[in-house]
């Protein structure tokens, strides 16, 4: 993480190590240092960040293993905060928590472990990019204005090169179209007599949110391709979601489904303190996964950036990895793209805060976590949202944050979970009981919620004017089933009224055929909105028609649930086969199939009454 200028200049400020406690180092003679300034500790020049200042003593959290540091070792000040290199070449790259490219380090040292104090450029500054300018000499520009674009890869076709948010001036020279590296100056600006050159990349401090022109309200859904999420608990692009769940509930599978099938332009996946083998699985799986864009099959790595920070890496880097991920997401958002950021898992980040807080002898709060836990979580989640970007041309972008939470023993009253639930707008609660029954995605439909339903109503009404009613009927059936289960366990199913039997049977269809989804089949790994809508409509039509014929028949001609099952078994079986329609067959053919099925349901029940 070296600065653009040489950090080893002779007049560089230097302190000395006074005490070491795990990842926390106390240094003296640090007068003139700033909070969150980047420092290099010891002869290995380990990367660290100042987190407390008292007199001329600084407390530093070190992002690398501190074994071997001794009292009196030098501490070099860089005069800069922890910053990222932002430019073309981020997508399909794998970084660690402080944006060091793992692949480059592996090729450099030929060892699977990262050596301490390794200094390497975050982005490949030798690779040439095909740059097409869109400004001319004499133009007045300010932060966020688009200079031109490069083709990052076949999915990220238009990577906009922007003026950094804190720069302005008049264009005095700009390069013509052609191939340039990240080292080349591509534009010169003059402001108040000072000339500044800009490259294809710029640096931005991770703890500072990138400025926006205005925040907008989200009104377009984040489509995940998972029916239970899209139909019952939808999120908006620019929303905040939490996925709490115990070990083995399928958090990572939902995260991967979002990466593969969500309607985002790019995905930033942060593995924060996860097990090494889980992260290895993601690193091995993602390059082999493909998505179909405009009829072409492309690797999803082309629109994904991985920030890998496993549980055996130093704890301090977990906090950095979360901020690294959100800063990368904001950079792509400023181009006018819709970005999904997965943080897996925020509990491990909170544990890192707890450990460092303990070493700083701060007063612990609930569960040993520091008192500022919820403030830190809030400042992270607040960086999500749909925004109008600064600069011209006018464009809108969004960052959606999906944070996985791993409460110990699946206990949702854990301080991290409760703090997260006070902040996020969508809660997808995973349940161990459902996962053990092999019901995936194991989202508990009784405790999960979304506060975006009203905001998304206009979108769903364009999909189907009746959609919101169908959704609430389905949710009501599932709620009633839960109440009836207690009665069934006491006195058996036969004692229920015919109306209640219909509720139980319909709920079973909703649970097993609609909410359950197999991520490993071609027909069910992704469910487009029209298929979700028609499946829901046909199930609700069956339920409402059943209730109607039972209510309208009377006396000796009273129609029972068993009679319905015997007389029109093909209709009931048809409901269980709806999900086997492959979206590859095309929307028109599938909609026609579901429409015919809907007509069959209505006519079959009409014939029952006759």
UniProtKB/Swiss-Prot annotation:
GO cellular component: proton-transporting V-type ATPase, V1 domain
InterPro entries for this protein: ATP-synt_VA_C (IPR055190), ATP-synth_a_Xtn (IPR031686), ATP_synth_asu-like_sf (IPR023366), ATPase_a/bsu_AS (IPR020003), ATPase_F1/V1/A1_a/bsu_N (IPR004100), ATPase_F1/V1/A1_a/bsu_N_sf (IPR036121), ATPase_F1/V1/A1_a/bsu_nucl-bd (IPR000194), ATPase_F1/V1_b/a_C (IPR024034)
Pfam family, one: ATP-synt_ab_N
EC number: 7.1.2.2
Gene3D superfamilies on file: 2.40.30.20, 2.40.50.100, Bovine Mitochondrial F1-atpase, Atp Synthase Beta Chain, Chain D, domain 3, P-loop containing nucleotide triphosphate hydrolases
Catalytic reactions of this protein: ATP + H2O + 4 H(+)(in) = ADP + phosphate + 5 H(+)(out)
rRNA-binding found in the keyword field: no
Keywords, comma-separated and alphabetical: ATP-binding, Hydrogen ion transport, Ion transport, Nucleotide-binding, Translocase, Transport
Binding site for ATP: 245-252
Gene Ontology MF terms: ATP binding; ATP hydrolysis activity; proton-transporting ATPase activity, rotational mechanism
The UniProt record lists the keyword NAD: no
SUPFAM superfamilies reported in the protein's UniProt record: C-terminal domain of alpha and beta subunits of F1 ATP synthase, N-terminal domain of alpha and beta subunits of F1 ATP synthase, P-loop containing nucleoside triphosphate hydrolases
CDD domains with a match to the protein in the record: ATP-synt_V_A-type_alpha_C (cd18111), ATP-synt_V_A-type_alpha_N (cd18119), V_A-ATPase_A (cd01134)
GO biological process: ATP metabolic process
Broadest EC class assigned to this enzyme: translocase
Subunit-structure text: V-ATPase is a heteromultimeric enzyme composed of a peripheral catalytic V1 complex (main components: subunits A, B, C, D, E, and F) attached to an integral membrane V0 proton pore complex (main component: the proteolipid protein).
Similarity comment: Belongs to the ATPase alpha/beta chains family.
Function: Catalytic subunit of the peripheral V1 complex of vacuolar ATPase. V-ATPase vacuolar ATPase is responsible for acidifying a variety of intracellular compartments in eukaryotic cells.
Protein's name according to its UniProt entry: V-type proton ATPase catalytic subunit A
Record organism: Trypanosoma congolense
Lineage: Eukaryota, Discoba, Euglenozoa, Kinetoplastea, Metakinetoplastina
